[in-house]
Amino acid sequence: MTVVGNPRSWSCQWLPILILLLGTGHGPGVEGVTHYKAGDPVILYVNKVGPYHNPQETYHYYQLPVCCPEKIRHKSLSLGEVLDGDRMAESLYEIRFRENVEKRILCHMQLSSAQVEQLRQAIEELYYFEFVVDDLPIRGFVGYMEESGFLPHSHKIGLWTHLDFHLEFHGDRIIFANVSVRDVKPHSLDGLRPDEFLGLTHTYSVRWSETSVERRSDRRRGDDGGFFPRTLEIHWLSIINSMVLVFLLVGFVAVILMRVLRNDLARYNLDEETTSAGSGDDFDQGDNGWKIIHTDVFRFPPYRGLLCAVLGVGAQFLALGTGIIVMALLGMFNVHRHGAINSAAILLYALTCCISGYVSSHFYRQIGGERWVWNIILTTSLFSVPFFLTWSVVNSVHWANGSTQALPATTILLLLTVWLLVGFPLTVIGGIFGKNNASPFDAPCRTKNIAREIPPQPWYKSTVIHMTVGGFLPFSAISVELYYIFATVWGREQYTLYGILFFVFAILLSVGACISIALTYFQLSGEDYRWWWRSVLSVGSTGLFIFLYSVFYYARRSNMSGAVQTVEFFGYSLLTGYVFFLMLGTISFFSSLKFIRYIYVNLKMD
């Protein structure tokens, strides 16, 4: 039976995409709010808890000795919420729309010394809980710790046994939710003997207030602790300063390079006119620089299958990154929604697999590749295999520690199904179209059978120096923005400056292209025609600088600790650097290829 001709088979292939679309929870740009009447019950879900400085080290809230129902009922979650480590469950809190609660008992508890020690350890590690009300996350600390360094030394630990919920509404919708511990004192957990029990009474209160804000997205998150709105001016000044430096650098490189190149073309073409009567074998006599290697500059490189796979996957991630930023600019990612970006990234990755297959197969056929099936397999494996290995290690560590970040088996099967039934087939389909639409490689100069000997190169034209220059300059263009992104991904902040992000992303690609052209010109001027892989490695090394920055961020800009958070941070930071290597290596290669074709087309030759 042929899959292509079977409508039912095609529907099975697109079924996971529909699941992903439904898994985002709501349509693009639509806020997931519920309409209430006065007195309607408002369900509060408990979610996860974990160290404040380790956002990816999360555990279920009911793993702590806290008030919980006799039978725990879990909320049905979307794919993005599961990937975000959410494990929502119903709680004992009774909240009704627009009905204030002065003080209500949640439960009475008798804690053993072991349970008290568990709470003490959680408070010492600054455990930070998350509840969810009407799809709005509300967060707070489990307890309070006071450390005194003066004599006599004191170390006090207390548990918050009363929570005050503040909810704002507009009409029949909840706009904002928050939790605080105002006007209460923590219950001391100190001085308990091993054979003693500690009696606790958990209480809560609810305050409702009306607001004129009509949409949740208009509610400034900076009002409850975010640092981005308060430092927006400094943020903009830093970005503008970085852009000015980048524009000066790009302008300097472009002007100098164009003047030198114009002089080279004029000199070479003049020499060609004076020696036009000479034979083809004498064409190179008296020449030097990039003209003399015109018969070798388009000589195909080794490992062409791997090169084409890098270009294909790099093009895919360029499309994926652009798509995510554009969707964010269009308001499709509400900051209050859980896992929306995760779901969108998986959906776009599966759909853009056709781009990697097309670009890789198209260029592979152009440069004379014959092992088409191997090229497709290499293209599909170039990112998926490193990602799977990294995820396996990270997920195993989470599973061993009982973290909610460990994916359930059903989610793993769903993701595997998406890749097998959507991602891989689209890669093959894109490869077929790319192979069939490929024309012969358009080389302005013929290539001789015998390769020219490359003269010794000075140290400043080595691959390492090119990688250092080509990686550092693009990295410097995004270094300021990188801090804010890291503070969002690996911290407790929220990033909403998508316009700046789009602009910086465009600057990054532009700088990478300009630097690649400059470095390729300097390489060809030294009569070194091995530019194919060099162009990929030079600017692609920006990914290495990003990984080195992640090491610096972990050591000097964050308070992350522990095996769970450390393994996840460095595992996915290494993967992020690899993705940037693929993206910028692709931009660098095609920029150099376009430049080389331009200069040799404009060179007069017999």
Swiss-Prot record:
**What does the sequence similarity comment in the record state about its family?**
Belongs to the nonaspanin (TM9SF) (TC 9.A.2) family.
Q: Which organism is it from?
A: Homo sapiens (Human)
| First and last residue of the signal peptide | 1-27
- Give me the glycosylation sites of this protein: 178, 401, 559
Q: Which Pfam families match?
A: EMP70
Q: What is the recorded function of this protein according to its Swiss-Prot or TrEMBL entry?
A: Plays an essential role in autophagy.
Where's it mainly located? Answer: membrane
Tissue specificity here reads:
Expressed in lung, pancreas, kidney, liver, placenta, skeletal muscle, heart and brain. The amount in skeletal muscle, heart and brain were considerably lower than in the other tissues.
The record's Gene Ontology biological-process terms are: autophagy; protein localization to membrane
Name recorded for this polypeptide: Transmembrane 9 superfamily member 1
Gene Ontology CC terms, in alphabetical order: autophagosome membrane; cytoplasmic vesicle; lysosomal membrane; membrane
What residue intervals traverse the membrane? Answer: 237-257, 310-330, 339-359, 373-393, 412-432, 469-489, 499-519, 535-555, 570-590
Topology in the lipid bilayer is annotated as: Multi-pass membrane protein
Q: Which UniProt keywords apply?
A: Autophagy, Cytoplasmic vesicle, Glycoprotein, Lysosome, Membrane, Signal, Transmembrane, Transmembrane helix
Query: Where found, per UniProt?
Result: Lysosome membrane; Cytoplasmic vesicle, Autophagosome membrane
